[in-house]
Swiss-Prot record:
GO terms for molecular function: ribosome binding; translation initiation factor binding; translation repressor activity. It comes from Bos taurus (Bovine). GO terms for biological process: apoptotic signaling pathway; cell differentiation; negative regulation of autophagy; negative regulation of CD8-positive, alpha-beta T cell activation; ribosome hibernation. This is Death-associated protein-like 1. Residues 1-26 are annotated as: Disordered. Transmembrane segments: none annotated. Keywords: Apoptosis, Differentiation. It holds the Pfam family DAP. The gene is DAPL1. It comes from the Eukaryota. Detected in the corneal epithelium, and only in trace amounts in the liver, bladder, brain, heart, and stomach.
Length: 107
């Protein structure tokens, strides 16, 4: 009995699942635990995210209202905010020279 060695077969080898051979190549297995965790639903998180979304929508509505009021008071500011800034000096690009390099044909 002293000579018997107990070998435990664990699904993890070296801290990760063993590779599977498919088509002559070794492919690492995906962990099934991660898949199960993704499919489980937590009802508590859904409720908090729904209330957070409602709060975000309300704040965005409040901001839109204030921006509308300001745009009526200052229409030029709202108009300029949507335009691209124009440079004071136009940049003149020099014409590019076309360099033709004569090369022998490939046979």
């Amino acid at each position: 009995m002293a000579n018997e060695v107990q070998v435990q077969l664990s699904p993890l080898k070296g801290g990760h699942p063993p590779a599977v051979k498919a088509g002559g190549k070794r492919i690492s297995k995906k962990q099934e635990i991660g898949i199960l965790e993704r499919h489980t639903k937590k009802t508590g998180l859904e409720k908090t995210s729904a209330t957070a979304n409602v709060a975000k929508i309300q704040t965005m509505d409040a901001l839109n209202d204030t921006l509308e009021k300001l745009s009526h008071k200052f229409p030029a500011v709202a108009h300029m905010a949507h335009q691209k800034p124009r440079p004071a000096l136009e940049k003149v690009t020099p014409l590019k020279r076309i360099y033709i390099i004569q090369q022998p044909r490939k046979c």
